Curated annotation (Swiss-Prot):
Stretches that traverse the bilayer: 201-221
Encoding gene per record: CXCL16
InterPro entries: CXCL16, CXCL16_dom
GO biological process entries: positive regulation of cell growth; positive regulation of cell migration; receptor-mediated endocytosis; response to tumor necrosis factor; response to type II interferon; T cell chemotaxis
Pfam families according to UniProt: CXCL16 (PF20902)
Keywords, sorted A to Z: Chemotaxis, Cytokine, Disulfide bond, Glycoprotein, Membrane, Signal, Transmembrane, Transmembrane helix
Family: Belongs to the intercrine alpha (chemokine CxC) family.
Subcellular location field: Membrane
Membrane topology: Single-pass type I membrane protein
Signal peptide: 1-24
Organism: Sus scrofa (Pig)
Region (Disordered): 105-186
Parts of the chain on the Extracellular side: 25-200
Protein name: C-X-C motif chemokine 16
Role of this protein: Induces a strong chemotactic response. Induces calcium mobilization. Binds to CXCR6/Bonzo. Also acts as a scavenger receptor on macrophages, which specifically binds to OxLDL (oxidized low density lipoprotein), suggesting that it may be involved in pathophysiology such as atherogenesis.
Length: 250
């Protein structure tokens, strides 16, 4: 036997020794449906184990002749026809158990205190400052009469029954605020108008400056061109002399 075949055979034996055998249809650890714990049909789980499975169940998987329940720290398998297996699958399918159900319940319990609100007391309407104080009194009382209040409530009466001085000061304050707001608005309008006029004048001045610059450049170019032409074609001196007829008498 060649040496490489011997090494290959020893390697295959070593790998086979590392892989643990499966238990019936359970499959090995390298299979598609492994189980960390197999519960026999003759010894179903206790109530404590069932509560643990209902609470921490992530999902389940149908294998050949059993069902595998996946937990956070391993998997538990049971026969497909076992009563506890059928109950656990039905509970998980209805959403009544499992980790998803536990998270939903915890979320609802967290939202419950936030949704519970203390009923707010109705706010008392503020007194109307534009009407006299007598309009806030009941119609059965005369303007000169004062409402009878129980003893120990003088401060509450002062707060609930506004006086004419308070109304007058409130009206004066509101009128002063209105006049001040009107003056501020007029001043703001003037400032806006001045700003708009200045912003409209800037483009006009810029356009005039550009026109003046272009005109100056054009005049400079024309003068330069005329000077060059006069240098290239000097004037004929004979054109400046006019022939004069000779005097016969002389």
């Amino acid at each position: 036997m060649p040496l490489w075949e011997l090494w290959f055979f020893l390697l295959a034996l070593f790998l086979a020794w590392l892989t643990p055998p499966g238990n019936g249809n359970e499959g090995s650890m390298a299979g598609s449906c492994p189980c960390n714990r197999r519960i026999s049909s003759h010894s179903p789980p206790t109530d404590h184990d069932m509560r643990h499975l209902r609470k921490y169940l992530n999902h389940y998987q149908h294998c050949t002749s059993y069902v595998r329940f996946q937990l956070p720290r391993g998997s538990v398998c049971g026969g497909s026809s076992d009563q506890w297996v059928l109950k656990l699958m039905g509970c998980f399918d209805r959403g009544e158990c499992g980790r998803a159900h536990a998270r939903t319940v915890a979320h609802q319990q967290h939202l419950a205190p936030q949704n519970t609100r203390v009923p707010e007391l109705p706010e008392r309407a503020p007194p109307d400052s534009s009407t006299p104080a007598q309009t806030n009194l009941p119609s059965t009382l005369q303007p000169t009469q004062k409402p009878t209040l129980p003893e120990g409530m003088p401060s509450l009466a002062k707060k609930l029954i506004p006086t004419s001085e308070t109304d007058t000061s409130t009206v004066g304050h509101s009128l002063g605020a209105k006049s001040e707001a009107r003056e501020n608005q007029e001043q703001l309008g003037k400032n806006v108008g001045a700003t708009a006029g200045t912003s409209a004048l800037v483009p006009v001045l810029s356009l005039l400056v550009i026109i003046f610059l272009l005109t100056g450049v054009l005049l400079y170019v024309m003068c330069k061109k005329r000077q060059e032409q006069s240098r290239q074609y000097p004037p004929d001196p004979q054109l400046h002399y006019v022939p004069v007829a000779s005097n016969i008498n002389t």
